[in-house]
UniProtKB/Swiss-Prot annotation:
Species the sequence originates in: Acidaminococcus fermentans (strain ATCC 25085 / DSM 20731 / CCUG 9996 / CIP 106432 / VR4)
Gene Ontology terms describing biological process: glutamate catabolic process via 2-hydroxyglutarate
Catalytic class of the enzyme: lyase
GO molecular function list: 2-hydroxyglutaryl-CoA dehydratase activity; 4 iron, 4 sulfur cluster binding; metal ion binding
A cellular component term, taken from the record's GO annotations: cytoplasm
Protein name: (R)-2-hydroxyglutaryl-CoA dehydratase, subunit alpha
Localization of this protein: Cytoplasm
Gene3D superfamilies with a match to the protein in the record: 3.40.50.11890, 3.40.50.11900
Keywords of this entry: 4Fe-4S, Cytoplasm, Flavoprotein, FMN, Iron, Iron-sulfur, Lyase, Magnesium, Metal-binding
Essential cofactor(s): [4Fe-4S] cluster; FMN; Mg(2+)
EC number: 4.2.1.167
Superkingdom of origin: Bacteria
Cofactor comment: Binds 1 [4Fe-4S] cluster per heterodimer.
Length: 477
C-alpha cells in the first residue's frame, strides 16, 4: 500500500516536477537552458526567465535511484579520478552522454555488455546469470542489474533492433532526463571542486560559463572588499545573461524574484525550526527530501507557498502533540554532513530501531538565504559550510545543538566532500568539550556507495546510543 503524503509534502513534490518539466519543455521549444550550481544566486536567472537544472540535485537523485556507482565508474573510465566528488563524477559522466541502463531485458537477455557498452546476446537464447555469475534480478532492489550506455553512441547507430533495445534499456526516471545545457552558472561558495567541474562541462559542450567567485571568509563577518568584489561579478553575470537571452535586465522582475526567494527562505527556515520542539513534530531526516525544492525553486512563489503549507501542518502537529516520525523519539541527534543518498534505507534503519530522531541538520538551513538589499544578498551567499572559518562553523553548530536540544552528534566523514570532512575531528572535540555531548563518526559518500560500510555505520550508531545513555545516567535523567 503506497504511503500517504500530506498536502504540503505533495505540493513540494509537485514544484520539483514542474521545474524539471518546464526545463525539458523549454529545451524542446528551442530556448536556451542551463545548469546551475545549487548556491548560485538563482534570482538572476529567474529574473531573465531562464530555465535551469541543478546537477547536484540531479546527482543526488541518480545516486538515490541506485545508479551512483555505475555513473561514477563511467566517469572514472573516461579519465576522472575516483578521488573527486561523487556528484561531480556523476554529472561529468552525464555531460559526456552516459546514462544508467539495464543490463538485461525482461526475458533475461543482455541488452548491452556491461564492460563495452555494446549489445551482447545470449548464444543459448536465455540467461539465468550474467557474465559475473550474478542473478538477472538484483535481490536487493528487485530490479535488473544496472550498467551505463551512451546516448551519443546510441544516436549514431542505424535504425534497427539494436538501437531500439538500447534506447529502451535507458533508465527513464526524472533525474536521467535533464537536457544538455546551453550555458552553465557556477558559484564556488560551496567548494573549489565546483569551479573545475563546471569549467569542464563548459569546455566539453563549448558553451558560456558564468562564474561568481566567492573568497573564503576567515572572519565572523563579510568585509566590504569582498562585497565589492562579488557585486562586480554580479554585474558581469547580468551582462552575460543579457547576451544569452537577448533581453535587457529588468530590475522590477529581479526585485520580485528576490521577494520570492526571501519568502521561500523564511518558510524553509521556519520548517527547520520546528525541530526545536520536544518531541519534534517530524523526523529531521525528511528535510533531506525537501531540499530539492529549496535548491531548484527558491526563486519561485510556488516553493514559498508549499513550504508555508508544510509549516502550517507542522504547527498543527505541535498543537495536537502528534508527529509524522514513524517511531517514538528517545534521543535527539544532529546529523553532520550530506547524507549517503545511495544508502538512505541503511542510514535510517538503525536510527529508527534506536529511537534516534535527527533534530539538527547543518546542511538544510544553509540554504536559507534571507536579505533586504543587494549587499545583504551578497553576504548571504558568502555563507556556506565550507566557506567560513572553523570558529564560525563551530558557533553555527553549537547554536543548533542548544536550540534543538541535541543529545549527540553523528558525523558523516564524506569521501566526496573532503573540505567539509577535513575539519570534523576538531569539531567533534569542540562539541564534546563545549556542549558535553558524545559524538560518533562513520565513513561514507554522498553518491558513491562503494565508500559506505553498513556494519561500521551500525556499530558507530550503537556506540553513540550507549554514550548518550551513559550521559543521561550521569545527569540523572
Amino acid at each position: 500500500m503506497p504511503k500517504t503524503v500530506s498536502p504540503g509534502v505533495q505540493a513540494l513534490r509537485d514544484v520539483v516536477e514542474k521545474v524539471y518539466r518546464e526545463l525539458r519543455e523549454a529545451k524542446e521549444r528551442g530556448e536556451k537552458v542551463g545548469w546551475s550550481s545549487s548556491k548560485f544566486p538563482c534570482e538572476l536567472a529567474e529574473s531573465f526567465g531562464l530555465h535551469v537544472g541543478y546537477p547536484e540535485n540531479q546527482a543526488a537523485g541518480i545516486a538515490a535511484n541506485r545508479d551512483g556507482e555505475v555513473m561514477c565508474q563511467a566517469a572514472e573510465d573516461i579519465g576522472y579520478d575516483n578521488d573527486i566528488c561523487g556528484y561531480a563524477r556523476i554529472s561529468l559522466a552525464y555531460a559526456a552522454g552516459f546514462r544508467g541502463a539495464n543490463k538485461m531485458d525482461k526475458d533475461g537477455n543482455y541488452v548491452i555488455n556491461p564492460h563495452s557498452g555494446k549489445q551482447m546476446k545470449d548464444a543459448n537464447g536465455k540467461k539465468v546469470f550474467d557474465a559475473d555469475g550474478k542473478p538477472v534480478i538484483d535481490p536487493k532492489t528487485l530490479k535488473p542489474f544496472a550498467t551505463t550506455d551512451n546516448i551519443y553512441e546510441i544516436a549514431a547507430l542505424p535504425e534497427g533492433e539494436e538501437k531500439t533495445r538500447r534506447q529502451n534499456a535507458l533508465h527513464k526516471y526524472r533525474q536521467m532526463t535533464m537536457p544538455m545545457p546551453d550555458f552553465v552558472l557556477c558559484c564556488n561558495n560551496i567548494c573549489n571542486c565546483m569551479t573545475k567541474w563546471y569549467e569542464d562541462i563548459a569546455r566539453r559542450h563549448n558553451i558560456p560559463l558564468i562564474m561568481i567567485d566567492v573568497p573564503y571568509n576567515e572572519f565572523d563577518h563579510v568585509n566590504e572588499a569582498n562585497v565589492k568584489y562579488i557585486r562586480s561579478q554580479l554585474d558581469t553575470a547580468i551582462r552575460q545573461m543579457e547576451e544569452i537571452t537577448g533581453k535587457k535586465f529588468d530590475e522590477d522582475k529581479f526585485e520580485q524574484c528576490c521577494q520570492n526567494a526571501n519568502r521561500t527562505a523564511k518558510a524553509w527556515l521556519k520548517v527547520c525550526d520546528y525541530l526545536q520542539y520536544k518531541p519534534a513534530p517530524f523526523n529531521g531526516f525528511d528535510l533531506f527530501n525537501h531540499m530539492a525544492d529549496v535548491v531548484t525553486a527558491r526563486g519561485r512563489v510556488e516553493a514559498a507557498e508549499a513550504f508555508e503549507l508544510l509549516a502550517k501542518e507542522l504547527e498543527q502537529h505541535v498543537k495536537e502533540g502528534t508527529t509524522t516520525a514513524p517511531f517514538k523519539e528517545q534521543h535527539r541527534i544532529m546529523f553532520e554532513g550530506i547524507p549517503c543518498w545511495p544508502k538512505l534505507p541503511n542510514l535510517f534503519k538503525p536510527l529508527k530501531a534506536n529511537g534516534l530522531n535527527i533534530t539538527g541538520v547543518v546542511y538544510a538551513p544553509a540554504f536559507g538565504f534571507v536579505y533586504n538589499n543587494l549587499d545583504e544578498l551578497v553576504k548571504a551567499y558568502c555563507k556556506a559550510p565550507n566557506s567560513v572559518s572553523i570558529e564560525q562553523g563551530v558557533a553555527w553548530r553549537e547554536g543548533l545543538i542548544r536550540d534543538n536540544k541535541v543529545d549527540g552528534v553523528l558525523v558523516h566523514y564524506n569521501r566526496s566532500c573532503k573540505p567539509w570532512s577535513g575539519y570534523m575531528p576538531e569539531m567533534q572535540r569542540r562539541f564534546t568539550k563545549d556542549m558535553g555531548i558524545p559524538t560518533a563518526g562513520f565513513d561514507g559518500d554522498q553518491a558513491d556507495p562503494r565508500n559506505f560500510n553498513a556494519a561500521q555505520y551500525e556499530t558507530r550508531v550503537q556506540g553513540l546510543v550507549e554514550a548518550m545513555e551513559a550521559n543521561d545516567e550521569k545527569k540523572g535523567k
